[in-house]
Amino acid sequence: MNQKNSLGLNKCFLDLDNPFQLFQRWFEEAKKKEINDPNALALGTANKEGIPSVRMVLLKGHSEKGFVFYTNLNSQKGNEIKENPNATMCFHWKSLLRQIRIVGTLKQVDDQTADEYYNSRAYDSRIGAWASKQSSILHSRDELLDAIENYKKKYNDKDNVPRPSHWSGWNLTPSTIEFWLDGDNRIHERLKYSLDKNGSWTKSLLSP
């Protein structure tokens, strides 16, 4: 029989009052077990009319301040976030039979943070941020490839490619974080952390 924590859950849930510590533990385990992109997450956003959309992005930073990803600010997701900052993230690690769902609000990171991450990227990725008008219609693939070549000529010094003003990061400040573990016969285990008005986290067990 699996060992249980004080709430009767599998020992992998630990006994932590801070969800960020539990996230860090699960994330480290995912990086060892998950074959591809353990930092991949489904990001759900909605426009001002409430029409939702979802796509996969990569987590590029996390702390008790939130969870960070980067994108073109003029993309569909970028425009939706400007209209409606409420969003959700979902990590699903098949190798661990675990999932983490996060709900919160998005805020753009500061320029220094965006610059530091942008400058850490490969040259071709930095050029791509200039060349791609993300989510806009292309008349042909060659249109994009030509733009890439033109920006490579413009920024031929690989150590000096400035960050486009339309490219930055978003930080999701969570209000709830739910941890999920697959169980036999669909009797899954769910632990939800909710942020109260005093800034403290409370834990709740949820029915599967």
Regions found by a protein language model. Name each.
Residues 1-208:
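Binding-site signature for planar aromatic cofactors or substrates
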